[in-house]
Amino acid sequence: MEPVNDFQEGISTEHAFEAEPVPSLSETITPRSMVVSFILSVTLSIVAMKVTLSSGFIPSFSIPAGLLGFCVSRASIRILDYFAVAQLPFTRQENTIIQTCVVACTSITFTGGFGTYILAMGKKAAVGDVNAQNNVEEPSFARMITFLFLISFAGMFIIMPFRKVMIIRHRLTFPSGTATAHLINSFHTPQGVKQARKQVTLLFKSFGGTIAWSLFQWFFASGPGCGFKFFPTFGLEAYKHGFFFDFTMANVGIGMMCPYMIVFSVFIGTIISCGVIWPYIESKEGIWYPSNLGPNSLNGIRGYKVFIGLSMIMADCLFVFLCIMVRTTCAMIKRRRQAMQGGGGNAQPFQGIDIADQPVKSFDDRRRAQVFLRDEIPDSVTIGCYVLLSIISIAAIPHLYPQMRYSHVALIYLAAPVFAFCNAYGFGVTDMNLASTYCKIAMFAFGSWVGIKSGGVVAALVAGGITMSILGNAADVAQDLKTGYLTLTSPRAVFISEAIGTALGCVVNPTVFWVFYRVYKMGSGDMGDMPYAKLYRGFAMLSVGDGEQGLPRHSMLLFKVFFVLALALSVFREVASRKEWRIRRYIPSTIGMAITFFMPPRVPVGMCIGSLVAYLWEKMDAGRGRMLSPALASGLICGDGVGSILLSMLTLMGARAPICIKFLSRGDNVKLDAFLATLHDMR
């Protein structure tokens, strides 16, 4: 983009678009934008579901959605031009609507709990739970869709009355939303078109190559333990402990997208957990826990994995939560003081709020505020819709999950507006969505309230799911409103697009999940690890006071020890960052280390390979590496997700791979040859 100098703010974005009229609502939400949104929503929901079920890491789809929305729309324009079909010009506002709709749909993959509380309620996650009789609810397709429609829209309505406070008055940054807006603005300039074309070309190449690779691997995976996924990359001894590369391209793509520190933390956590702690605890088999238990029993080694990892995550979440609250409170007090100093008791919304403390609004601010305030949705309408949704949910949710009472649901919806605003405000200041943290707080509160005998585990998971959905969606809407503000997109158009994407996600995501779940139940799926489902089950069990019952020896002692260690690491990391010590770059993330206690080492191995590729690429060609590595990563993730759906469809249709390829040690190979020779002689 060619920014223009403005005497008040130095650099102006809107001067470059000054000659373009702001499109109306009908020119922004068009049939073209809805068709493109539907195609991309379905595709990226498949990808997000595959990632959340297999690894638990969900990268942001804001940039891929904006990029793909731009390129698919431009391609459709060229096709229609070829057939001489009249059409509206493609604007940045329409691009924003597509991005908003797609992200609203894919975000339900996370807030809908498909990889967390939905699976945590099932029998697979409850293996070894001695009180599982009233604390298990198997996934049901109809119940999932109904539940999502009940809980997914409340956050949208409750955050709308706060939009002017956060966007106009306090001018919250929302870093990810701002970055997405700048990306979309840059696309709609001549320079941006050239860059986007290069990115999309690489994205589709990696997308197609990954699908082809997935289909190629399928031909050699005719049975358990067959295929390239079981290649002993680092030798057979490392393979026995789970250290190998399984050629899952999604993990490589995630590693390319994640910050180096997160990948480094995951690597360190894998070495500590799978290389040191688990081998030591396994050596105590028969002493600390019975030796005849399966790997998924909470009475065995899984009990250590769940509660050690749980303790570290709790410590980090507690520390981050307190830090966010302190920062948010200080920011609000500081801005309030600046406003009072700038204009006394009658300070204008734009005065004394920005860090630069500019007394006069810039051209960009004036134009954006004009559009943002023009198409308003009355607060009475949004509040009324929230109240109506609350009443319906209070009446319906206890019928879907009998462990929840009417009073439980009512209390959640009564407290949600306060916490939704707090979470959205903190999200705007720090770019950290703490919906999952509030979810865990709700789980502890309602799990202890209901109790283990009355189904407290399921009640805790349902309460956490409602909380996470309302707060997570509210923060996402606030961020999308910021993106719309910076691209001159009407807040009414953003809200409508958000509602369409949410409704689409309430149908698409359960359908995609059900396909994966059906394949998994047939014995061919890749959901066996369920890292976050085990984590949420552990949280729920701890909330009902069932933590020590049936668990192996010393598990709760280790819980307390690792809680203290993780808290100390989080404090040390924060202090080092504030003091700007040199060592701060090498202090691992607590949450990054903790999640490795719930996943097999092959996932971090793939992430490390992806991070190494991105690092070497940037070292060799910094400009192209930074510009193209996100596109390559997106193609790998998308291709792996779509490839998984294709393989799942083959399984559902009864197709079987023709070849089995296995990797054996030299001794096992000699024994196998001898056995085959005896069979040949018998013939």
UniProtKB/Swiss-Prot annotation:
UniProt source species: Oryza sativa subsp. japonica
Primary localisation category: membrane
Name this protein carries in UniProt: Probable metal-nicotianamine transporter YSL7
Compartment(s): Membrane
Keyword terms: Membrane, Transmembrane, Transmembrane helix, Transport
Cysteine disulfide links: none
Tissue expression from the record: Expressed in roots.
Signal sequence, start to end: none
Pfam families reported in the protein's UniProt record: OPT
